[in-house]
Amino acid sequence: MVMTDPIADFLTRIRNANLAKHEVLEVPASNIKKGIAEILKREGFVKNVEVIEDDKQGIIRVFLKYGQNGERVITNLKRISKPGLRVYSKREDVPKVLNGLGIAIISTSEGLLTDKEARQKNVGGEVIAYVW
C-alpha cells in the first residue's frame, strides 16, 4: 500500500494510541516525524522519544504521557497542510491554537518550530499540524 501522507499517518497513530491509552507507540522514522516527535516532547505532550536505528529507515518510539488520574495530555491532533492543499502562514499571521493552550507545528526556513518560536524568530512557513 502506498502512503500518500506519512505525516497524517503519524498523527493518526499517535491519536489512536492515545485514545486506547497505550504507553508506547512505534512508527517508521523520517526526518520530519523525528522533528514533530521532538517538538511534542519539548512541549510536554509526550514523555520521551527514542530513535532506533536499523538497516532500513529506523523506528521512532514515542512514550505517551497521561495525567495523575489517567487523563490524556494530548486532547487532539489535527493535520492542517495536506498534500492536496498546502497551508502557509506569513510571519505576521502565525496561528494561535486555543488562545495559546495548544501549539501549531510550522515548517520554516529555520526548521520545524512551534507557533511561539516562529513568532519569536519572526518567520512564517507551512502549517503542519495543531496539537492541543
From Swiss-Prot:
Keywords: Ribonucleoprotein, Ribosomal protein, RNA-binding, rRNA-binding. It comes from the Bacteria. One of its GO terms (cellular component) is ribosome. One of its GO terms (biological process) is translation. PANTHER family: 40S RIBOSOMAL PROTEIN S15A. The gene is rpsH. One of the primary rRNA binding proteins, it binds directly to 16S rRNA central domain where it helps coordinate assembly of the platform of the 30S subunit. Part of the 30S ribosomal subunit. Contacts proteins S5 and S12. GO terms for molecular function: rRNA binding; structural constituent of ribosome. SUPFAM superfamilies: Ribosomal protein S8 (SSF56047). Pfam families: Ribosomal_S8 (PF00410). InterPro entries: Ribosomal_uS8, Ribosomal_uS8_CS, Ribosomal_uS8_sf. PROSITE patterns: RIBOSOMAL_S8. This is Small ribosomal subunit protein uS8. Belongs to the universal ribosomal protein uS8 family.
